[in-house]
């Protein structure tokens, strides 16, 4: 009876010994005090990677040395995120001057594998006129109502050291692999600065937390070696030539193992064989299906199966009556969110049988007509394109979305009709056309809106659009991602107030899940590059598109225009280059640029800075719609 038990024990111990040997870390440095020092960070020549040098002092504290003799204490280290947090310097006693001004602030050596993350919001204070002019032209927000003034008035340390100081700016740093400075402090420009990490601009200054600077490190490569003996601490590796650097050798993992840059080990490559990879990669999915997300996925699968069967019946030349039956079933689920189910007779009468004279617009989804109901109400009627299954499902999707929302800056769905050959939606009528039409001509009043639209109204349009999108992201459960934010989907009513429209491509998010994986759809020029490349739809995808709309409002230029120079076809690239070169005002729409007051110029620059943040290539570096709405509100208060 004991032999099987002994055999099992022996087998288990053998496995433990095997796996522990395959995951032995390579030269990790000893703890500094009570703080673990993960690979590749190095506190000595015989551990870690020497290129990732930090210091451990005699008191058990870690320090990060930067250029010009400056050094900052390390507060926390996140090895999985490959980042650590520094404590920035404070003020000199009773002066609005940073302690490290003689070192010119925190600047990194561009030859080392560190860079500043995009999580940092930097406030610079005590600026000269030259400093304000220079930084304002570089895209910093130096307006009278900017965030930095709230900090000066509410932060106890700043208020004590900078009493009477009114000149300041703020900006977001980082967001690229070549950002090597937090701020270059100079007495002839701005002599004090402070940094905060993951700052929520909507909360009071008193709740900002302690100052911090987040630094990223690049994933380390395999250790350098001269002979196989140098690889003895990295099991399952062999010293061989580095094909990317002639004359250099590295400890490369043997076949069947792969380099784990976080733990500095050669781990078993469980996906080296297709079957094995498939088996292991399914484990997280099976765990997820056990929860609420799994229920949603299962429901989606069932729905897709039903729809697929219906599509096959349609393909078999059966009548559209079966499609209408499917729609009727779907709509009955959401009927409590609709004001009314219209008859086919009512719709035909309201639109004069879809007369061309009532046609308001058309697109891939179908056509939109103006209609008049018997009670005198003017409505907009959207009809799916005949024979186009995709447009039908977009309309059904729009019903499912709009039945769940109600906001003054979102177009209101009044009802639907499923008696006609194609499904129809009925909306409130928004009489002043789209923002696109007004910017580029053909709008509600005939000529372009910009002949009489001042900067304040443009800011109000931006603010109301942001509020509508923020409602979708923050107040809906689950969140809703619009997926097609653009100037032609922003309607303007008789008071030029915003109604965000066209939810045919919108998607429901999943609570507590960072993104929805879906095929990239949207409009060229507005499409989030991360969404396009990775198929990960998030709230930040809408933020990117909104940033493009802000650029349109500022410049009166189209998102994509092949009449511009080849390198400037994309509006984001065009304006980003102007911001980087400090000449934003050169590309501002002359209608608001020429003759603008100093405060208006500051407001335009502040909006340009916000727009540039919204179109950051990395979604984590973009603000939320709530933060964007709050910042535009602050800009509005300044003019």
Curated annotation (Swiss-Prot):
Residues 304-639 are cytoplasmic. Its EC number is 2.7.11.-. Its main location: membrane. The active site is at 484 (proton acceptor). The chain crosses the membrane at residues 283-303. Residues 354-639 form the Protein kinase domain. Pfam families: PK_Tyr_Ser-Thr. GO terms for molecular function: ATP binding; protein serine kinase activity; protein serine/threonine kinase activity. Residues 26-282 are extracellular. It is found in: Membrane. Residues 1-25 form the signal peptide. Keywords: ATP-binding, Glycoprotein, Kinase, Membrane, Nucleotide-binding, Serine/threonine-protein kinase, Signal, Transferase, Transmembrane, Transmembrane helix. It catalyses: L-seryl-[protein] + ATP = O-phospho-L-seryl-[protein] + ADP + H(+); L-threonyl-[protein] + ATP = O-phospho-L-threonyl-[protein] + ADP + H(+). Belongs to the protein kinase superfamily. Ser/Thr protein kinase family. This is Wall-associated receptor kinase-like 15.
